Regions:
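N-terminal accessory targeting/assembly segments
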Residues: 1-102
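Short, acidic Gly/Pro/Ser/Thr-rich loop/turn segments
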Residues: 10, 129, 202
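Flexible beta-alpha connector loops of hexameric P-loop NTPases
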Residues: 9-15, 45-49, 107-112, 152, ...
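A residue-level signal for conserved active-site and pocket-lining positions in enzyme catalytic cores
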Residues: 23, 122, 160
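Conserved G1/Walker A P-loop phosphate-binding module
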Residues: 132-243
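Short acidic/polar capping segments at secondary-structure boundaries
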Residues: 98-99, 127, 159
Length: 243
């Protein structure tokens, strides 16, 4: 179930429908089956329930009728909102950022990319630990037992923080190695040219057409996450590195 909540103002419904179409495309890319779409425009977004308590109850009834397992909010939720909605609905509750990070986790192929995605997921999700025990298990890979005097939640937070610290150390080392490779490329006096564009704009398709790179190119949002670099010979005889 997709949910968009916005303020009443001129053009708000048109914007909501546009964002909802993109959110649905993101959900489909993540492998989620969308069975319902909810748009609510309010005088102000409810600071606790986002939708408003009454509207949330009616949405929950619809979710039960449709056998919904997950609510995906178009806007980012703060930890209190995510926890409150999950507790009242007993559904998995995620927001746009978490959905995009999930897609990144599916698409990342390089070691560097996987580390960056996991670090981003931990940083975003750590403040949200505690809404549900299963959310804690998903984040930390399962919690076996308790530390002395610690609750399951405290153990989960501690282990998540430890993992986050390890990832930051690994990424620091990866950054050093990447800088060394970049210095080697620039020492060859070969210009590096970047292809820049919005997701699904055709960057990978263009790279393949110019260099026969063989990079995955699909009509999906964030189909390719990792950067690929290939040497390209120009008609004048010069070479460039195209990324």
């Amino acid at each position: 179930m997709l949910v968009h909540v916005g303020q009443k103002k001129p053009g708000a419904m048109r914007l909501a429908k546009t964002r909802m179409r993109e959110l649905e495309a993101l959900a489909e890319t993540a492998g989620v089956e969308v069975v319902e779409r909810i748009i609510q425009l309010r005088d102000r977004v409810d600071p606790k329930y986002v939708l408003g308590k009454g509207k949330l109850e009616s949405v929950l009834i619809k979710a039960i009728d449709l056998d919904v397992e997950t609510m995906i909010f178009d806007q980012n939720l703060n930890p209190t909102q995510a926890s409150t909605i999950a507790s009242r609905t007993d559904l998995a509750v995620i927001d746009r950022t978490q959905l995009i990070l999930d897609i990144f986790a599916q698409r990342a192929e390089s070691k560097d990319g996987k580390l960056q995605v996991e670090l981003a997921q931990l940083k975003y999700s750590l403040p949200r630990l505690g809404a549900k025990d299963d959310a804690l298990s998903r984040l930390t890979g399962g919690i076996g037992g308790r530390g002395p005097g610690e609750t399951k939640l405290e153990v989960g937070r501690r282990r998540a923080q430890e993992r986050l610290n390890r990832l930051e150390r690994q990424l620091k080392e990866q950054t050093k190695q990447r800088a060394q490779r970049r210095r080697r490329r620039t020492s060859d006096d070969v210009p590096v040219v970047a292809i820049v564009g919005y997701t699904n704009a055709g960057k990978s398709t263009l790279l393949n057409a110019l260099t026969n790179a063989g990079v995955l190119a699909e009509n999906k949002l964030f189909a390719t996450l990792d950067t690929r670099s290939r040497r390209l010979s120009l008609p004048q005889g010069n070479n460039i590195i195209l990324s």
